[in-house]
Amino acid sequence: MSTRDRTETTTEVGLLDALLDAYQGEVFGVAMYRRVTESLDDPWQRWQWECLTRVEVELRDELAAALLRLGHTAIPDEGEHAAGLAEAERIVGLPWLEMLHEFTYDLPPLVERYSAIAVDHESAVDVVGCREVLDRLVRHEVASIEFHHAELAGRAPIDSIGPVVALLTGPIPDPPIE
């Protein structure tokens, strides 16, 4: 049974579906990033991945709050969680740079998709108060791309993860002690 209020406009329903899709994408991402983090032995790589995971968690929670403001409870889809774990298993064990290279294909389409949500539903985005979370969603994907490219270019771990760390609103994981 749908919990959608009959007074929602078509634009709001489209926005709701887009936000639900983005939320489930973060459910996938949290599962994947956590599993990859658990698999890493190098302390700097593990720290970087923990930072990436924290951003995923924050965005998942922010999207859940945005959905709640729209009157909908975000329920993590077990299929998305399982798919995130399966994706992690596919890349766990790959050499570091090869694993990072895998993400260079997946992230740019997400920037386009999340940017399009705000444009396609412009009239509803501000009304329901979700522009900030959509903007942050785009910035997080862009920061992830910057991280992957910086790592592939050989930048220092503390520098390459900088754009991601800058997005964290909660506590920043402690970097490894050398």
Which stretches of residues belong to each language-model region?
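Non-heme di-metal
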Residues: S2-E178
